[in-house]
Amino acid sequence: MLRSHLLLVSSFAILHSSFSAQPNVIVILADDLGWSDTTLYGHTAYYQTPNVERLAKRGMTFTRAYSASPLCSPTRSALLTGQSPARTGITVPNCHVPQVVLQATTGKKAPVDQKAIQPDPVTRLKTEYRTLAETLKDAGYATAHFGKWHLGPEPYSPLQQGFDFDLPHHPGPGPAGSFVAPWKFTNFKEKSPGEHIEDRMAAEAVAWMEQTKDKPFYMNYWMFSVHAPFDAKKANIETHRGRIDPKDAQRSPTYAAMIQSMDDAIGTLLDGLDRLKLADNTIII
Protein backbone atom coordinates (compact mmCIF):
# COMPACT_ATOMS: atom_id res chain seq x y z
CA MET A 1 0.00 0.00 0.00
CA LEU A 2 1.00 3.62 -0.27
CA ARG A 3 0.68 5.48 3.01
CA SER A 4 0.93 8.79 1.22
CA HIS A 5 1.92 10.15 -2.11
CA LEU A 6 4.48 12.82 -2.87
CA LEU A 7 3.51 14.41 -6.15
CA LEU A 8 6.23 16.18 -8.05
CA VAL A 9 5.75 17.39 -11.57
CA SER A 10 9.03 18.14 -13.26
CA SER A 11 8.25 19.41 -16.69
CA PHE A 12 11.45 20.50 -18.29
CA ALA A 13 9.24 21.34 -21.24
CA ILE A 14 7.29 23.82 -19.13
CA LEU A 15 10.47 25.57 -18.05
CA HIS A 16 11.79 25.68 -21.61
CA SER A 17 9.51 26.80 -24.42
CA SER A 18 11.14 24.63 -27.09
CA PHE A 19 9.47 21.22 -26.88
CA SER A 20 7.76 18.98 -29.36
CA ALA A 21 4.05 18.34 -29.76
CA GLN A 22 4.69 14.88 -28.30
CA PRO A 23 6.93 15.23 -25.25
CA ASN A 24 8.13 12.09 -23.50
CA VAL A 25 6.30 11.21 -20.27
CA ILE A 26 7.72 9.43 -17.23
CA VAL A 27 5.60 8.60 -14.18
CA ILE A 28 7.65 7.80 -11.06
CA LEU A 29 5.75 6.21 -8.19
CA ALA A 30 7.28 5.27 -4.84
CA ASP A 31 5.54 2.66 -2.71
CA ASP A 32 4.77 3.20 0.98
CA LEU A 33 6.86 6.37 1.13
CA GLY A 34 5.73 8.67 3.93
CA TRP A 35 5.27 12.32 3.05
CA SER A 36 7.78 13.33 5.73
CA ASP A 37 10.42 10.79 4.66
CA THR A 38 12.21 12.99 2.13
CA THR A 39 14.25 16.14 2.68
CA LEU A 40 12.07 18.01 0.21
CA TYR A 41 9.68 19.47 2.78
CA GLY A 42 12.11 19.87 5.66
CA HIS A 43 10.71 17.21 7.98
CA THR A 44 13.73 14.92 8.11
CA ALA A 45 17.48 15.24 8.32
CA TYR A 46 18.15 11.54 8.72
CA TYR A 47 16.65 10.28 5.47
CA GLN A 48 18.55 11.82 2.57
CA THR A 49 16.97 12.44 -0.84
CA PRO A 50 19.16 14.78 -2.92
CA ASN A 51 17.79 13.52 -6.23
CA VAL A 52 14.19 14.09 -5.17
CA GLU A 53 15.23 17.67 -4.40
CA ARG A 54 17.09 17.85 -7.71
CA LEU A 55 13.92 16.83 -9.52
CA ALA A 56 11.80 19.34 -7.63
CA LYS A 57 14.16 22.22 -8.39
CA ARG A 58 13.71 21.57 -12.10
CA GLY A 59 9.93 21.60 -11.94
CA MET A 60 6.97 22.17 -9.64
CA THR A 61 5.88 20.74 -6.30
CA PHE A 62 2.37 20.25 -4.98
CA THR A 63 1.95 20.47 -1.23
CA ARG A 64 -1.82 20.19 -0.90
CA ALA A 65 -3.65 17.18 -2.23
CA TYR A 66 -6.50 14.80 -1.51
CA SER A 67 -6.29 11.07 -2.08
CA ALA A 68 -9.47 9.12 -2.73
CA SER A 69 -7.66 6.02 -1.48
CA PRO A 70 -4.09 6.29 -0.14
CA LEU A 71 -3.34 2.66 -0.90
CA CYS A 72 -1.35 0.73 -3.46
CA SER A 73 -3.61 -0.84 -6.10
CA PRO A 74 -6.33 1.84 -5.88
CA THR A 75 -3.74 4.54 -6.58
CA ARG A 76 -2.30 2.62 -9.52
CA SER A 77 -5.68 1.98 -11.10
CA ALA A 78 -6.64 5.64 -10.72
CA LEU A 79 -3.40 6.86 -12.30
CA LEU A 80 -3.83 4.61 -15.32
CA THR A 81 -7.54 5.09 -15.94
CA GLY A 82 -8.43 8.51 -14.55
CA GLN A 83 -11.24 6.77 -12.66
CA SER A 84 -11.76 6.93 -8.91
CA PRO A 85 -11.12 3.73 -6.92
CA ALA A 86 -14.83 3.59 -6.11
CA ARG A 87 -15.62 3.43 -9.81
CA THR A 88 -13.07 0.74 -10.71
CA GLY A 89 -13.96 -1.20 -7.56
CA ILE A 90 -10.28 -1.51 -6.63
CA THR A 91 -10.41 -0.07 -3.13
CA VAL A 92 -7.86 -2.26 -1.32
CA PRO A 93 -4.43 -3.63 -2.31
CA ASN A 94 -5.44 -7.23 -3.03
CA CYS A 95 -4.86 -7.59 -6.78
CA HIS A 96 -2.33 -10.38 -6.16
CA VAL A 97 -4.86 -12.83 -4.68
CA PRO A 98 -5.79 -15.90 -6.77
CA GLN A 99 -9.51 -15.09 -6.88
CA VAL A 100 -10.52 -13.09 -9.95
CA VAL A 101 -13.21 -10.58 -9.00
CA LEU A 102 -14.19 -8.07 -11.69
CA GLN A 103 -17.29 -6.55 -10.09
CA ALA A 104 -17.53 -5.10 -6.60
CA THR A 105 -20.44 -6.34 -4.52
CA THR A 106 -22.13 -5.21 -1.34
CA GLY A 107 -20.47 -6.53 1.77
CA LYS A 108 -22.47 -8.81 4.01
CA LYS A 109 -20.53 -8.77 7.27
CA ALA A 110 -17.77 -7.07 9.22
CA PRO A 111 -15.86 -7.65 12.47
CA VAL A 112 -17.78 -6.56 15.54
CA ASP A 113 -15.27 -3.78 16.25
CA GLN A 114 -15.57 -2.31 12.75
CA LYS A 115 -18.00 0.59 12.36
CA ALA A 116 -18.94 -0.05 8.73
CA ILE A 117 -19.44 -2.94 6.32
CA GLN A 118 -17.08 -2.57 3.40
CA PRO A 119 -17.92 -3.68 -0.15
CA ASP A 120 -16.24 -6.79 -1.49
CA PRO A 121 -13.65 -5.25 -3.84
CA VAL A 122 -12.40 -5.99 -7.34
CA THR A 123 -9.12 -7.90 -7.60
CA ARG A 124 -8.07 -7.06 -11.19
CA LEU A 125 -7.95 -3.94 -13.35
CA LYS A 126 -10.46 -4.78 -16.05
CA THR A 127 -9.10 -4.47 -19.58
CA GLU A 128 -12.29 -2.70 -20.67
CA TYR A 129 -10.98 0.51 -19.09
CA ARG A 130 -8.97 2.63 -21.47
CA THR A 131 -5.60 3.30 -19.87
CA LEU A 132 -3.18 6.17 -20.29
CA ALA A 133 -0.75 3.72 -21.90
CA GLU A 134 -3.32 2.66 -24.51
CA THR A 135 -4.18 6.27 -25.30
CA LEU A 136 -0.56 7.31 -25.76
CA LYS A 137 0.27 4.15 -27.69
CA ASP A 138 -2.51 4.98 -30.15
CA ALA A 139 -0.93 8.44 -30.47
CA GLY A 140 2.35 6.92 -31.60
CA TYR A 141 4.17 6.54 -28.29
CA ALA A 142 6.40 3.66 -27.28
CA THR A 143 5.26 2.42 -23.86
CA ALA A 144 7.03 0.60 -21.04
CA HIS A 145 6.36 -0.35 -17.44
CA PHE A 146 9.18 -0.92 -14.97
CA GLY A 147 8.66 -2.24 -11.46
CA LYS A 148 5.65 -2.95 -9.31
CA TRP A 149 2.28 -3.47 -11.00
CA HIS A 150 -0.12 -5.00 -8.46
CA LEU A 151 -3.18 -4.72 -10.70
CA GLY A 152 -3.38 -8.37 -11.67
CA PRO A 153 -1.34 -11.08 -13.41
CA GLU A 154 -1.93 -12.28 -16.96
CA PRO A 155 -4.32 -11.55 -18.65
CA TYR A 156 -4.43 -8.26 -16.72
CA SER A 157 -0.72 -7.47 -16.78
CA PRO A 158 0.89 -4.33 -18.27
CA LEU A 159 1.20 -6.17 -21.58
CA GLN A 160 -2.61 -6.33 -21.79
CA GLN A 161 -3.07 -2.73 -20.59
CA GLY A 162 -1.24 -0.81 -23.31
CA PHE A 163 2.42 -1.37 -22.51
CA ASP A 164 4.83 -2.72 -25.12
CA PHE A 165 7.41 -3.73 -22.52
CA ASP A 166 7.20 -4.83 -18.89
CA LEU A 167 10.04 -5.55 -16.47
CA PRO A 168 10.25 -7.63 -14.32
CA HIS A 169 6.69 -8.71 -15.24
CA HIS A 170 5.83 -9.50 -11.63
CA PRO A 171 2.24 -9.22 -10.31
CA GLY A 172 3.00 -9.39 -6.59
CA PRO A 173 2.71 -6.71 -3.90
CA GLY A 174 6.47 -6.45 -3.37
CA PRO A 175 9.77 -7.60 -4.83
CA ALA A 176 10.02 -11.35 -5.29
CA GLY A 177 11.95 -12.47 -2.23
CA SER A 178 13.98 -9.38 -1.43
CA PHE A 179 15.32 -6.09 -2.74
CA VAL A 180 18.85 -7.43 -2.80
CA ALA A 181 19.72 -10.42 -4.99
CA PRO A 182 19.31 -13.35 -5.08
CA TRP A 183 15.71 -12.62 -6.10
CA LYS A 184 12.85 -14.99 -6.84
CA PHE A 185 11.44 -13.37 -9.97
CA THR A 186 10.35 -15.99 -12.49
CA ASN A 187 12.15 -14.67 -15.55
CA PHE A 188 14.36 -11.92 -14.19
CA LYS A 189 17.74 -12.83 -12.75
CA GLU A 190 20.40 -10.67 -11.17
CA LYS A 191 23.51 -9.78 -13.17
CA SER A 192 25.78 -9.72 -10.14
CA PRO A 193 25.70 -11.00 -6.54
CA GLY A 194 23.96 -8.62 -4.17
CA GLU A 195 22.46 -6.52 -6.96
CA HIS A 196 19.69 -4.18 -5.78
CA ILE A 197 16.42 -4.30 -7.69
CA GLU A 198 16.17 -0.50 -8.00
CA ASP A 199 19.72 -0.22 -9.36
CA ARG A 200 18.95 -2.83 -11.97
CA MET A 201 15.54 -1.47 -12.95
CA ALA A 202 16.83 2.08 -13.29
CA ALA A 203 19.67 0.90 -15.52
CA GLU A 204 17.25 -1.13 -17.63
CA ALA A 205 14.91 1.87 -17.88
CA VAL A 206 17.72 4.11 -19.15
CA ALA A 207 18.72 1.43 -21.66
CA TRP A 208 15.12 1.27 -22.89
CA MET A 209 14.98 5.07 -23.22
CA GLU A 210 18.17 4.98 -25.27
CA GLN A 211 16.71 2.35 -27.59
CA THR A 212 13.51 4.39 -27.94
CA LYS A 213 14.90 7.94 -27.98
CA ASP A 214 13.96 8.61 -31.62
CA LYS A 215 10.29 8.04 -30.81
CA PRO A 216 8.10 9.70 -28.17
CA PHE A 217 7.76 7.43 -25.15
CA TYR A 218 5.65 6.96 -22.05
CA MET A 219 7.34 5.10 -19.22
CA ASN A 220 6.07 4.03 -15.82
CA TYR A 221 8.84 3.73 -13.28
CA TRP A 222 6.85 2.28 -10.39
CA MET A 223 9.29 1.35 -7.67
CA PHE A 224 9.13 -1.57 -5.30
CA SER A 225 10.77 0.81 -2.81
CA VAL A 226 10.12 1.40 0.01
CA HIS A 227 7.49 -1.27 0.59
CA ALA A 228 8.25 -4.34 2.71
CA PRO A 229 10.29 -6.54 2.97
CA PHE A 230 12.62 -4.31 4.91
CA ASP A 231 16.07 -5.01 3.57
CA ALA A 232 18.71 -2.97 1.81
CA LYS A 233 22.37 -2.87 0.84
CA LYS A 234 24.38 -3.79 3.92
CA ALA A 235 26.99 -1.09 3.33
CA ASN A 236 24.30 1.59 3.16
CA ILE A 237 22.63 0.28 6.31
CA GLU A 238 25.92 0.56 8.21
CA THR A 239 26.52 4.07 6.87
CA HIS A 240 23.17 5.25 8.17
CA ARG A 241 23.58 3.35 11.44
CA GLY A 242 26.48 5.66 12.21
CA ARG A 243 24.25 8.72 11.67
CA ILE A 244 21.51 7.84 14.16
CA ASP A 245 20.35 10.52 16.56
CA PRO A 246 18.57 8.68 19.41
CA LYS A 247 16.41 11.76 20.00
CA ASP A 248 15.13 11.73 16.42
CA ALA A 249 11.87 9.87 15.73
CA GLN A 250 13.30 8.82 12.36
CA ARG A 251 16.19 6.53 13.19
CA SER A 252 15.87 3.31 11.18
CA PRO A 253 19.14 2.68 9.30
CA THR A 254 17.49 0.00 7.15
CA TYR A 255 14.70 2.32 6.07
CA ALA A 256 17.22 5.11 5.46
CA ALA A 257 19.17 2.75 3.19
CA MET A 258 15.98 1.81 1.35
CA ILE A 259 15.19 5.48 0.77
CA GLN A 260 18.75 6.01 -0.45
CA SER A 261 18.29 3.29 -3.10
CA MET A 262 14.99 4.86 -4.13
CA ASP A 263 16.65 8.25 -4.47
CA ASP A 264 19.64 6.80 -6.33
CA ALA A 265 17.27 5.29 -8.90
CA ILE A 266 15.72 8.71 -9.52
CA GLY A 267 19.22 10.09 -9.99
CA THR A 268 20.01 7.37 -12.53
CA LEU A 269 16.92 8.28 -14.54
CA LEU A 270 17.74 12.00 -14.46
CA ASP A 271 21.36 11.36 -15.44
CA GLY A 272 20.17 9.18 -18.30
CA LEU A 273 17.81 11.86 -19.59
CA ASP A 274 20.59 14.44 -19.47
CA ARG A 275 23.10 12.17 -21.21
CA LEU A 276 20.63 11.28 -23.95
CA LYS A 277 19.67 14.97 -24.32
CA LEU A 278 16.02 14.13 -23.68
CA ALA A 279 15.46 16.22 -20.56
CA ASP A 280 14.14 19.31 -22.32
CA ASN A 281 11.45 17.26 -24.03
CA THR A 282 10.39 15.07 -21.10
CA ILE A 283 7.64 15.54 -18.54
CA ILE A 284 8.22 13.70 -15.26
CA ILE A 285 5.39 13.17 -12.79
Question: For the regions a protein language model found, what residue spans apply to each?
Answer:
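Short, basic, low-complexity termini and linkers enriched in Ser/Thr/Gly/Pro
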Residues: 1-21
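Formylglycine-dependent sulfatase
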Residues: 19-285
